[in-house]
Protein backbone atom coordinates (compact mmCIF):
# COMPACT_ATOMS: atom_id res chain seq x y z
CA UNK A 1 0.00 0.00 0.00
CA UNK A 2 2.78 2.41 0.87
CA UNK A 3 4.44 1.72 -2.49
CA UNK A 4 1.15 2.45 -4.26
CA UNK A 5 0.69 5.67 -2.32
CA UNK A 6 4.24 6.73 -3.12
CA UNK A 7 3.62 6.07 -6.79
CA UNK A 8 0.39 8.08 -6.72
CA UNK A 9 2.15 10.92 -4.93
CA UNK A 10 4.88 10.93 -7.57
CA UNK A 11 2.27 11.05 -10.32
CA UNK A 12 0.50 13.93 -8.57
CA UNK A 13 3.75 15.89 -8.31
CA UNK A 14 4.42 15.26 -12.01
CA UNK A 15 0.94 16.43 -13.01
CA UNK A 16 1.22 19.57 -10.91
CA UNK A 17 4.57 20.34 -12.49
CA UNK A 18 3.13 19.79 -15.95
CA UNK A 19 0.18 22.06 -15.15
CA UNK A 20 2.62 24.78 -14.18
CA UNK A 21 4.44 24.32 -17.46
CA UNK A 22 1.21 24.54 -19.42
CA UNK A 23 0.24 27.79 -17.72
CA UNK A 24 3.53 29.49 -18.54
CA UNK A 25 3.77 30.68 -22.14
CA UNK A 26 6.13 32.55 -24.41
CA UNK A 27 4.28 35.48 -25.94
CA UNK A 28 5.68 36.57 -29.29
CA UNK A 29 5.34 40.34 -29.50
CA UNK A 30 5.87 42.73 -32.41
CA UNK A 31 6.38 46.19 -30.89
CA UNK A 32 7.05 49.66 -32.19
CA UNK A 33 10.20 51.33 -30.89
CA UNK A 34 8.01 54.17 -29.62
CA UNK A 35 7.34 52.23 -26.43
CA UNK A 36 10.56 50.21 -26.31
CA UNK A 37 12.03 51.81 -23.20
CA UNK A 38 8.81 51.24 -21.26
CA UNK A 39 8.22 47.66 -22.42
CA UNK A 40 11.82 46.66 -21.74
CA UNK A 41 11.20 47.58 -18.12
CA UNK A 42 7.71 46.08 -17.96
CA UNK A 43 8.38 42.74 -19.69
CA UNK A 44 10.28 41.15 -16.77
CA UNK A 45 7.68 42.46 -14.33
CA UNK A 46 4.93 40.78 -16.36
CA UNK A 47 6.92 37.55 -16.52
CA UNK A 48 7.49 37.59 -12.76
CA UNK A 49 3.79 38.18 -12.11
CA UNK A 50 2.40 35.61 -14.55
CA UNK A 51 5.17 33.25 -15.59
CA UNK A 52 4.53 34.23 -19.21
CA UNK A 53 7.61 35.49 -21.05
CA UNK A 54 7.28 38.22 -23.70
CA UNK A 55 9.63 37.65 -26.64
CA UNK A 56 9.72 41.07 -28.28
CA UNK A 57 10.79 42.10 -31.79
CA UNK A 58 11.41 45.86 -32.14
CA UNK A 59 10.98 47.98 -35.28
CA UNK A 60 9.00 50.96 -36.50
CA UNK A 61 5.27 50.40 -36.76
CA UNK A 62 5.46 50.76 -40.54
CA UNK A 63 8.09 48.02 -40.86
CA UNK A 64 6.13 45.67 -38.60
CA UNK A 65 2.93 46.21 -40.57
CA UNK A 66 4.76 45.24 -43.77
CA UNK A 67 6.14 42.11 -42.13
CA UNK A 68 2.72 41.01 -40.93
CA UNK A 69 1.14 41.74 -44.30
CA UNK A 70 3.90 39.62 -45.86
CA UNK A 71 2.86 36.66 -43.74
CA UNK A 72 4.74 36.91 -40.43
CA UNK A 73 2.74 36.42 -37.26
CA UNK A 74 2.91 37.34 -33.59
CA UNK A 75 0.72 36.74 -30.57
CA UNK A 76 0.55 40.44 -29.74
CA UNK A 77 0.97 43.54 -31.89
CA UNK A 78 1.98 46.72 -30.03
CA UNK A 79 1.81 49.49 -32.60
CA UNK A 80 0.53 52.97 -33.23
CA UNK A 81 -3.26 52.99 -33.21
CA UNK A 82 -3.25 53.93 -36.88
CA UNK A 83 -1.07 50.94 -37.80
CA UNK A 84 -3.07 48.55 -35.64
CA UNK A 85 -6.25 49.73 -37.36
CA UNK A 86 -4.70 48.78 -40.72
CA UNK A 87 -3.95 45.25 -39.53
CA UNK A 88 -7.36 44.91 -37.89
CA UNK A 89 -9.03 45.92 -41.14
CA UNK A 90 -6.95 43.26 -42.92
CA UNK A 91 -8.07 40.67 -40.32
CA UNK A 92 -4.48 40.29 -39.11
CA UNK A 93 -5.31 41.35 -35.55
CA UNK A 94 -8.20 41.59 -33.14
CA UNK A 95 -8.30 44.78 -31.10
CA UNK A 96 -10.68 45.27 -28.19
CA UNK A 97 -12.01 48.34 -26.42
CA UNK A 98 -8.88 48.36 -24.26
CA UNK A 99 -6.51 48.49 -27.26
CA UNK A 100 -5.09 51.98 -26.58
CA UNK A 101 -2.86 52.00 -23.51
CA UNK A 102 -0.71 55.14 -23.85
CA UNK A 103 0.11 58.13 -26.04
CA UNK A 104 2.98 60.53 -26.61
CA UNK A 105 3.91 63.70 -28.42
CA UNK A 106 7.05 64.81 -30.21
CA UNK A 107 9.93 66.57 -28.48
CA UNK A 108 13.17 68.37 -29.22
CA UNK A 109 16.54 67.46 -27.70
CA UNK A 110 20.09 68.81 -27.85
CA UNK A 111 23.43 67.33 -26.89
CA UNK A 112 23.98 67.35 -23.14
CA UNK A 113 25.30 70.75 -22.06
CA UNK A 114 24.47 72.50 -25.35
CA UNK A 115 22.41 75.71 -25.35
CA UNK A 116 18.67 75.12 -25.52
CA UNK A 117 16.83 77.19 -28.13
CA UNK A 118 13.48 78.80 -27.49
CA UNK A 119 10.73 76.56 -28.90
CA UNK A 120 7.88 77.92 -26.78
CA UNK A 121 5.81 79.18 -29.73
CA UNK A 122 5.39 78.10 -33.35
CA UNK A 123 7.39 81.11 -34.54
CA UNK A 124 10.16 80.48 -32.00
CA UNK A 125 10.35 76.82 -32.98
CA UNK A 126 10.51 77.72 -36.66
CA UNK A 127 13.36 80.15 -35.97
CA UNK A 128 15.20 77.52 -33.91
CA UNK A 129 15.10 75.16 -36.88
CA UNK A 130 16.33 77.87 -39.24
CA UNK A 131 19.16 78.81 -36.86
CA UNK A 132 20.35 75.22 -36.40
CA UNK A 133 23.28 74.10 -38.55
CA UNK A 134 21.82 70.60 -38.78
CA UNK A 135 18.69 68.85 -37.56
CA UNK A 136 17.75 65.18 -37.28
CA UNK A 137 14.43 63.40 -37.49
CA UNK A 138 13.21 59.98 -38.62
CA UNK A 139 13.38 59.34 -42.35
CA UNK A 140 9.85 59.71 -43.73
CA UNK A 141 10.79 57.25 -46.48
CA UNK A 142 11.01 54.55 -43.78
CA UNK A 143 7.36 55.13 -42.93
CA UNK A 144 7.80 56.01 -39.24
CA UNK A 145 4.93 58.12 -37.90
CA UNK A 146 7.09 60.92 -36.48
CA UNK A 147 9.22 61.25 -39.63
CA UNK A 148 6.23 61.37 -41.96
CA UNK A 149 4.50 63.94 -39.78
CA UNK A 150 7.55 66.17 -39.32
CA UNK A 151 8.35 66.25 -43.03
CA UNK A 152 4.80 67.50 -43.64
CA UNK A 153 5.16 69.98 -40.78
CA UNK A 154 8.24 71.53 -42.40
CA UNK A 155 6.20 72.01 -45.57
CA UNK A 156 3.37 73.50 -43.53
CA UNK A 157 5.79 75.98 -41.93
CA UNK A 158 7.16 76.89 -45.37
CA UNK A 159 10.76 75.87 -44.68
CA UNK A 160 10.96 72.38 -46.20
CA UNK A 161 13.33 73.41 -49.01
CA UNK A 162 15.41 75.48 -46.62
CA UNK A 163 15.93 72.49 -44.31
CA UNK A 164 16.78 69.85 -46.94
CA UNK A 165 20.49 70.59 -47.07
CA UNK A 166 20.94 70.41 -43.31
CA UNK A 167 18.75 67.44 -42.41
CA UNK A 168 20.10 64.09 -41.20
CA UNK A 169 18.13 60.87 -40.80
CA UNK A 170 18.99 57.88 -38.60
CA UNK A 171 18.88 54.39 -40.13
CA UNK A 172 15.51 52.57 -40.14
CA UNK A 173 14.40 51.84 -36.55
CA UNK A 174 17.23 54.14 -35.40
CA UNK A 175 16.99 57.13 -33.07
CA UNK A 176 17.61 60.68 -34.26
CA UNK A 177 18.86 61.62 -30.78
CA UNK A 178 21.93 59.46 -31.39
CA UNK A 179 22.94 61.84 -34.19
CA UNK A 180 22.86 64.71 -31.69
CA UNK A 181 25.04 62.77 -29.25
CA UNK A 182 27.48 61.99 -32.07
CA UNK A 183 27.70 65.68 -32.99
CA UNK A 184 26.07 65.14 -36.39
CA UNK A 185 23.05 67.32 -35.61
CA UNK A 186 22.28 70.29 -33.38
CA UNK A 187 18.64 69.37 -32.78
CA UNK A 188 16.76 66.08 -32.89
CA UNK A 189 13.00 65.84 -33.19
CA UNK A 190 11.27 62.55 -32.46
CA UNK A 191 8.68 60.91 -30.20
CA UNK A 192 9.42 61.95 -26.61
CA UNK A 193 9.74 58.42 -25.14
CA UNK A 194 12.18 57.48 -27.89
CA UNK A 195 14.58 60.39 -27.37
CA UNK A 196 14.31 60.11 -23.58
CA UNK A 197 15.86 56.66 -23.80
CA UNK A 198 19.15 58.03 -25.19
CA UNK A 199 21.98 58.97 -22.83
CA UNK A 200 23.94 62.17 -23.45
CA UNK A 201 21.06 64.47 -24.40
CA UNK A 202 19.16 67.30 -22.75
CA UNK A 203 15.44 67.70 -23.29
CA UNK A 204 14.50 71.09 -24.74
CA UNK A 205 10.80 70.33 -24.53
CA UNK A 206 7.74 69.25 -26.48
CA UNK A 207 6.82 70.86 -29.76
CA UNK A 208 4.40 73.79 -29.37
CA UNK A 209 0.90 72.46 -28.87
CA UNK A 210 -0.34 73.86 -32.19
CA UNK A 211 2.38 71.94 -34.03
CA UNK A 212 2.67 68.76 -32.02
CA UNK A 213 1.35 65.40 -33.13
CA UNK A 214 0.00 63.03 -30.49
CA UNK A 215 0.48 59.35 -31.27
CA UNK A 216 -1.70 56.75 -29.57
CA UNK A 217 -0.20 53.31 -28.91
CA UNK A 218 -2.42 50.25 -28.98
CA UNK A 219 -2.19 46.48 -28.64
CA UNK A 220 -4.07 43.76 -30.47
CA UNK A 221 -4.07 39.96 -30.54
CA UNK A 222 -2.50 38.46 -33.65
CA UNK A 223 -4.81 36.42 -35.86
CA UNK A 224 -4.38 32.72 -35.18
CA UNK A 225 -2.39 33.27 -31.98
CA UNK A 226 -1.91 30.11 -29.92
CA UNK A 227 -1.23 32.25 -26.83
CA UNK A 228 -4.26 34.52 -26.96
CA UNK A 229 -4.96 34.20 -23.22
CA UNK A 230 -1.41 35.16 -22.28
CA UNK A 231 -1.45 38.00 -24.80
CA UNK A 232 -4.75 39.25 -23.37
CA UNK A 233 -3.22 39.16 -19.90
CA UNK A 234 -0.36 41.31 -21.18
CA UNK A 235 -2.80 43.86 -22.57
CA UNK A 236 -4.51 44.02 -19.16
CA UNK A 237 -1.10 44.44 -17.54
CA UNK A 238 -0.40 47.46 -19.77
CA UNK A 239 -3.37 49.17 -18.07
CA UNK A 240 -2.22 48.36 -14.53
CA UNK A 241 -1.10 51.09 -12.10
CA UNK A 242 2.40 49.59 -12.17
CA UNK A 243 2.59 49.89 -15.95
CA UNK A 244 1.10 53.38 -15.92
CA UNK A 245 3.81 54.58 -13.55
CA UNK A 246 6.49 53.25 -15.89
CA UNK A 247 4.84 54.89 -18.90
CA UNK A 248 4.88 58.27 -17.16
CA UNK A 249 8.56 57.89 -16.29
CA UNK A 250 9.37 57.23 -19.96
CA UNK A 251 7.57 60.24 -21.42
CA UNK A 252 4.26 58.52 -22.21
CA UNK A 253 0.78 59.51 -21.10
CA UNK A 254 -1.15 56.44 -19.87
CA UNK A 255 -4.63 55.89 -21.24
CA UNK A 256 -7.55 55.65 -18.86
CA UNK A 257 -7.95 52.08 -17.66
CA UNK A 258 -10.98 50.36 -19.25
CA UNK A 259 -13.80 49.28 -16.99
CA UNK A 260 -13.34 45.89 -15.39
CA UNK A 261 -9.54 45.98 -15.27
Which residue ranges define each predicted feature?
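Exported/periplasmic ABC-transporter solute-binding proteins
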Residues: 22-62, 66-73, 78-104, 110-261
Amino acid sequence: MSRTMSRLAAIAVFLIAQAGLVKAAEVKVFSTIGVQAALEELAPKFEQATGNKPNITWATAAILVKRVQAGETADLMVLTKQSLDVLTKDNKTTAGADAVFASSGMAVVVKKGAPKPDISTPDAFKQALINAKTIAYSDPAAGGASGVYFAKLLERMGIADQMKGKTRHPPPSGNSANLVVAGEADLAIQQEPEVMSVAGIDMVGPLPADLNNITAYAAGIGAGSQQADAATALIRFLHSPEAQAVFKSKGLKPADAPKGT
